[in-house]
Structure formats: structure tokens, C-alpha cells
Amino acid sequence: MTQQLKLTIELVPQTCWYSNLRNEVTRSTWDKIRKSSYAKYGYRCAICGGDSRLNCHEIWHYDDQNHIQKLAGFIALCDMCHHVKHIGFAAILAEEGNLDYEKLVQHFMKVNNCTPRVFEDHRTSAFDQWRERSKHNWNTNLGEYQSLIES
């Protein structure tokens, strides 16, 4: 039986990097989206409840059959939870000396009340999925958020 995790790793396929709403809308529009997200979650991290600096994280759903990534919404995340979501990028920051990778692992284990083995298994599975998804070109569907893009 697989443990249900509160905080998960969500690696964006390499072929989808930079295909997101934030890169398509004006700064003022993105500010409205992120501030709305922060307010929705009471100015706290939606996953761990932390009240440190927040990030607006895009939630994507992937149709692995038709290779469509669809924007499903937004969630307010603290820096630690956000770095776990994007742990591949976080590893690069850690290699550059800009982030303590072990603190991210500890945060993952604390939030999920789990062992290092659970973290390692989850990370391995996430990277396996990322490698498979990165073999394909994806169509981006912004769904209800498409109208926010100025022509």
C-alpha cells in the first residue's frame, strides 16, 4: 500500500518548460492571480500551513495519452514546499550553493510524516515519470485562464 502524501514532487516535463500562464500574462495580471491565491489560502502555505514568503504555484494536470498539459488552478506555497514541488530545479540551486537540499528532504519528511525511504521512492518515481513525459511534445491548455492573455 502506498502512503498518501500531503506534499508531492511535481516535475514539469522538459518539453513544457516555460509553457505556463505566468510567462503569458502581464505582470499586473500575474500579481492579481498570485495575490488572489494567497488570500484564498489565508496567507499561509496550503500544504504545510507555514506563514513565510509565499509563491503562487500553477497546478497542472497531464493527459498522458493525448499529451495535453492543462492548467487546473493555483495554490499558495511557502518556499520550502515550492522547492520540493520543483525538486529538480532545487537540486541545481543546491549545487550552486543557493539552497540546502537536505533541509528540503527534511521538510518533505516532516510534512508527510515519513521516512527517508519514502522520500527516495517518491523522488525516483517522480523522475521516472518526468523522463517518460519529457519524451513527448505537449499541447498546453490554459482552460478557463486562456482569457487572461491579452492579444
Question: Where do the language-model regions lie?
Answer:
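A boundary/linker detector
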Residues: 1-33, 52, 98-151
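Histidine-centered nuclease catalytic patch
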Residues: 26, 34, 38, 46-76, ...
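Histidine (H) residue identity feature
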Residues: 57, 61, 82-86, 107, ...
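Short microdomains enriched in Cys/His and/or Lys/Arg
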Residues: 63-80, 98-114
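Short leucine-rich amphipathic alpha-helical surface patches
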Residues: 82-85, 89, 112-116
